């Protein structure tokens, strides 16, 4: 009986700390307002994250998308809902359709539009205009397709 209880608690602990697989519809739980940033004399879209996104902040998530190799020499990659030809940077979709990748290993190399599933800690960014609104920290490749 004691053995059964121990096994139950181990399984419960594993499930409670497990990563959550999400899709892009979850990240769409955000609204934007124009915010003037004096430092750069421009208006930016300021995010107001919805409850389902705020619930994921600081948690490990898994998401599949197209890797955009923005600057591979600097290990700077973006995960996008769509390929480069139809991504946020080309005027299709909003900022909620991209996630900045802070890779755990600088040895990861991707090619443009490579489809990959990435695992990392989701950070919500509303203050730094030089980074994306969604950032995956300690990101690792979960699956390459």
Where are these regions (language model features)?
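OB-fold and OB-like single-stranded nucleic-acid-recognition modules
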Residues: 18-145
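Sec-dependent N-terminal signal peptides
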Residues: 4-14
């Amino acid at each position: 009986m004691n053995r059964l209880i121990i096994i139950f608690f181990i399984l419960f602990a594993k499930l409670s700390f497990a990563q959550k697989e999400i899709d892009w519809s979850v990240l769409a739980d955000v609204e934007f307002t124009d915010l003037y940033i004096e430092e750069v004399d421009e208006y930016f879209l300021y995010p107001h994250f919805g409850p389902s996104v705020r619930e994921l902040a600081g948690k490990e998530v898994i998401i599949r998308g197209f890797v955009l190799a923005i600057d591979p020499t600097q290990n700077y990659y973006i995960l996008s809902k769509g390929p480069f030809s139809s991504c946020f940077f080309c005027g299709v979709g909003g900022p909620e359709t991209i996630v900045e990748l802070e890779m755990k290993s600088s040895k990861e190399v991707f090619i443009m539009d490579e489809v990959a599933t990435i695992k990392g800690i989701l950070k919500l960014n509303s203050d730094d205009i030089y980074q994306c609104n969604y950032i995956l920290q300690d990101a690792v490749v979960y699956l390459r397709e």
